[in-house]
Regions:
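Bacterial N-terminal signal peptides that target proteins for export
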Residues: 1-11
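Surface-exposed extracytoplasmic segments
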Residues: 22-232
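C-terminal motif of bacterial Sec signal peptides marking the signal peptidase cleavage site
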Residues: 17-20
Length: 232
């Protein structure tokens, strides 16, 4: 089985056929609580760029650790994120399910080893091509043996990048943006309590400026607005 980096397409489809439905209860009972993440870029969501929603579910109420972008080569080993996270959704045109895939990190000490779980509950790009919206149920992001109802807090980040270099000898720059002022505070992420329904918006925090793409000024990577919701 493929274990390093992103699975090759053939391996990915075989895995999904064998195990892609395992994350849903056999009874068909839906998990009531959902995480809804949406964000907008200054330009357009480009199919050849990579857009990530990273989720850290480790009961960290103080928000000590969370998912952050690597700021220099070798780019975290996976090409897009480092820090602490167990799940992520990627949008990229080469992926199945209209370019959306939910992944589970298999080893917290090796963030380049992923297991594809299939499509998010909902995922779409807005008609104007500027916004991306993803919905995942808590059953899909629960830790091994964890009741989804016991998820009380999450750390969340959004990362947009033009490429995901995995070669440790690749020292060339890449463009990226994440939540917060990426040029001044690249280690920003959200800590969201999930014990009740709530909506957190960029307007509530003022943490996301425009024009903060690192190593470039590409509007298609420039995150300018976001909203995160916990919904029952």
């Amino acid at each position: 089985m493929c274990t390093r980096g992103r699975f090759q397409t053939t391996c990915l489809f075989l895995f999904l056929l064998l195990a892609g439905c395992a994350r849903f209860p056999e009874t068909g009972q839906a998990v009531s609580k959902r995480l809804v993440v949406q964000f907008r870029v200054a330009g357009q969501i480009r199919p050849d760029y990579h857009y990530f929603i990273l989720i850290d579910n480790d009961n960290d109420f103080l928000g000590v650790n969370g998912p952050v972008p690597p700021i220099a080569p070798p780019w975290g080993g996976n090409g897009f994120a480092t820090g602490s996270f167990q799940y992520f959704v990627e949008h990229y045109s080469a992926l199945p399910f209209n370019g959306f895939m939910l992944y589970k990190v298999l080893d917290p000490d090796r963030l380049q080893v992923f297991q594809p779980l299939g499509a998010p509950l909902e995922a779409s790009v807005s008609p104007d091509g500027k916004s991306l919206r993803v919905v995942v149920d808590f059953g899909s992001i629960a830790r091994e043996g964890q009741d989804p109802a016991d998820i009380r807090v999450l750390q969340i980040n959004v990362i947009a990048t033009d490429r995901t270099p995995k070669d440790p000898t690749d020292t060339s720059l890449k463009m990226w943006d994440a939540l917060g002022d990426s040029r001044q505070s690249p280690n920003s992420y959200l800590t969201l309590q999930t014990d009740a329904d709530r909506i957190l918006r960029n307007a509530d925090t003022g943490m996301e400026p425009a024009g903060d793409v690192v190593n470039g000024n590409d509007p298609d990577l420039d995150i300018v607005d976001w909203q995160v919701e916990v919904r029952s």
